[in-house]
Curated annotation (Swiss-Prot):
PANTHER family: DNA MISMATCH REPAIR PROTEIN MLH, PMS, MUTL (PTHR10073), DNA MISMATCH REPAIR PROTEIN MLH1 (PTHR10073:SF12). Belongs to the DNA mismatch repair MutL/HexB family. This is DNA mismatch repair protein MutL. PROSITE patterns: DNA_MISMATCH_REPAIR_1. GO terms for molecular function: ATP binding; ATP hydrolysis activity; ATP-dependent DNA damage sensor activity; mismatched DNA binding. This protein is involved in the repair of mismatches in DNA. It is required for dam-dependent methyl-directed DNA mismatch repair. May act as a 'molecular matchmaker', a protein that promotes the formation of a stable complex between two or more DNA-binding proteins in an ATP-dependent manner without itself being part of a final effector complex. GO terms for cellular component: mismatch repair complex.
Length: 576
């Protein structure tokens, strides 16, 4: 069926604004972002946010900024109406957050909105807006400032509504946004009420250090390196995490340029280069950095939500960063040397006639809790059942081919079975065994979960802890029982066998970090992604040789769940 050509026409303003909203307003957090930026641009130093239903039910932002006169409100609802610029050239000397004049009309076109505002000494007015158009305006006294209430977000664009995530995920996105706002804006007081409960409160008198401790935790501040360096018009201020606080992704990095939260691969790369000799490969440092640059050096007009930036004079910026970071790290050089040069001295006894060294975990005992069957796990893909062979001869725990350890060559092991000699790649094997340990019920449910005599604790940010709280049931289905002991920490009550404690803690933190940032990602995908990114030692000394038996009980797989080579049979051709 072919469509007949139609005449070219101008779109009406509501349709134009709804299209624009598709670029600017991704979810409820996008609405909160635009409204609080309007408050900041209006000179507010107290901002109060309330949300219901993750923001889709209601968003209210109240401030004590300059406010508007009644006749300004209809103008503010027009596309490209702004008080920030008059000409295009003004963008390059901009000190405000917004400048396009698109946000307010875009939000109004996909919600029901109410604006209550007054200038100093003014009478005040309240305007009701539906589908982007004012339907009622009446006098309403109030103190100087503006309150914007947004109800029924996406009510008239059901297709957009169907693509939204859960209210819990929306709350996580709003929390991360507000945490960045708290870090970027000193001298501003913040209050966030979510579902009628106070989630965040920051007094405007609280300084930068207090705010970093609130968001990232006091332990981060205590161990981090503080930097504050200025060269002419350039300044860098913030905290660099200690070498012990590295992560598997860049999600622990918070960057602000001229008080705007942005992403910059250039800045991240420069910081990573400074840490290269102090943290393992494929790991990323944590930092909170605020750069203050001349406005004409920064182009924020790259992304609709202004989360990306182009920079001029990268050489000067790089020099400032390198000097500031080097000075900070050198001030703590003794402790760094101790961290970097510490070599494990524990010897692991090996018997060449077989694997007789058990996996010793003195802090853990067997518990009656059994790992759930796979049918109880809606979170994991059924396709992943191919990880464990379904051939009863190879997958049985009672009838399994014997494997004999021969020698260690650092990154690989040489082992022998009835088929011949195999090269086992340590890192890939460790990763695969960690992953399969999460699915230990695949081994005919013979492997009981393990309970810690003294529960180990794991710490993270409040945002990450909130995500983990929502996934406790899914983690229990994997044999991992957690209990929340503070707003930013959990106790690990039990775990699958054959997972080392430190690796488990690292993975839990990585899962929380990844989940808090990618709020729409499925749980099974998060599990797979985070295990892939986890750095397992390439050193055979760190490999528990008793796990070779388990590897062979899994049918001695050649490849890990992600396709990486685990073992290879040594053939005669290898010596020709």
């Amino acid at each position: 069926m072919s469509l007949s050509p139609s005449r070219i026409r101008l779109l009406d303003s509501v349709t134009v604004n709804q299209i624009s909203a598709g670029e600017v307003i991704e979810n409820a957090a996008s609405v909160v972002k635009e409204l609080i930026e309007n408050s900041l641009d209006a000179g507010a130093d107290e901002i109060h946010i309330e949300t219901l239903g993750g923001g889709r039910g209601q968003i209210v932002v109240r401030d004590n900024g300059v406010g508007m006169d009644p006749e300004e409100v209809p103008v503010a609802l027009q596309r490209h109406a702004t008080s920030k610029i008059a000409h295009f050239a003004d963008i390059f000397s901009l000190a405000s957050y917004g400048f396009r004049g698109e946000a307010l009309p875009s939000i109004a076109s996909i919600s029901k909105m109410e604006i209550h505002t007054a200038r100093a000494g003014g009478l005040g007015s309240k305007t009701l807006i539906e589908k982007g158009e004012p339907v009622c305006c009446e006098p309403a006294p109030r103190q100087q400032g503006t309150t914007i209430a947004v109800h029924s977000l996406f009510y008239n664009v059901p297709m957009r509504q169907s693509f939204q995530k859960s209210p819990q995920m929306d709350r996580l996105a709003i929390r991360r946004l507000l945490e960045n706002s708290v870090l970027s804006s000193e001298g501003i007081g913040w209050t966030w009420i979510s579902e009628c409960r106070q989630e965040l409160y920051v007094a405007k008198k609280q300084g930068f250090i207090e705010r970093v401790a609130l968001v990232l935790g006091e332990s981060f501040v205590q161990e981090a390196f503080f930097i504050d360096k200025q060269q002419g018009d350039l300044r860098v201020l913030g905290f660099l995490g200690s070498p012990n606080q590295h992560r598997s992704t860049r999600q622990g990095q918070r960057l602000f340029i001229n008080n705007r939260a942005v992403e910059s691969s250039f800045i991240s790369k420069k910081v990573a280069e400074a840490y290269a000799w102090m943290i393992p490969a494929q790991r990323y440092p944590i930092f909170v950095l605020k750069l203050f640059l001349p406005p004409m050096w920064c182009d924020f007009n790259v992304h609709p939500q202004k989360t990306e930036v182009r920079l001029l004079q990268e050489g000067q910026i790089s020099n400032l960063l390198v000097e500031a970071i080097s000075e900070a790290l050198l001030r703590r050089s003794p402790s760094l040397e101790e961290t970097v040069l510490k070599v494990p001295t524990e010897k692991i006894p090996i018997e060449n006639e077989g694997i007789s060294v058990p996996s010793i975990r003195p802090a853990i005992v067997s518990a009656p809790l059994s790992c759930p069957t796979f049918s109880q796990q809606p979170y994991l893909k059924t396709e992943m059942a191919t990880i464990v062979s379904r051939d009863s001869a190879s997958s049985s725990l009672s009838v399994v081919e014997k494997v004999r350890f021969l020698t260690s060559l650092g990154k690989v092991l040489l082992v022998e079975d009835s088929e011949g000699v195999h090269v086992v790649f340590v890192q890939a094997a460790r990763k695969h065994l960690f992953y399969v340990s999460l699915l230990s019920e695949r081994l005919e449910s013979r492997l009981a979960c393990q309970t810690f005599l003294l529960p180990s604790s794991v710490q993270m940010t409040k945002l990450e802890a909130d995500f983990l709280q929502m996934r406790l049931e899914a983690l229990t289905a994997l044999g991992i029982e957690l209990s929340r002991i503070s707003p930013d920490s959990f106790a690990i009550e039990s775990a699958p066998p054959f997972i080392q404690e430190e690796e488990l803690k690292e993975w839990i933190v990585a899962l929380a970090q990844e989940g808090a940032l990618h709020v729409g990602e499925s749980f099974e995908q998060l599990v797979e992604n985070t295990v892939q990114k986890l750095v397992f030692s390439r050193n055979a000394r760190a490999f528990d040789y008793a796990w070779l038996d388990i590897l062979w009980k899994l049918g001695k797989p050649e490849k890990a769940f992600d396709g990486e080579m685990i073992r290879r049979l040594v053939l005669d051709d290898d010596f020709m």
